[in-house]
Amino acid sequence: MATDADVIIEVILCIFLPPLAIWWHTKECDINVLIDIIFCLLFWLPGILYAVYICFFRK
């Protein structure tokens, strides 16, 4: 179970460093981190949206 501090850190990371937010949430460097890096290189907003999806909506 995530604490309030973890949720706040994830929100901040989702906005400023989306790939790091996914790594923080999953605790591993997997394909989701790579996909988010590609999204961030193409345009920042898709990277943010993908990070929010992985961190908060995907179980």
Curated annotation (Swiss-Prot):
Main location: membrane
InterPro entries with a match to the protein in the record: PMP3 (IPR000612)
Membrane topology reported for the UniProt record: Multi-pass membrane protein
Source species, domain of life: Eukaryota
Swiss-Prot/TrEMBL keywords: Membrane, Transmembrane, Transmembrane helix
One term under GO cellular component: membrane
GO biological process terms on file: innate immune response
PROSITE patterns: UPF0057
Family note: Belongs to the UPF0057 (PMP3) family.
Name of the protein in question: UPF0057 membrane protein txt-9
Subcellular location: Membrane
Ranges annotated as spanning the membrane: 5-25, 37-57
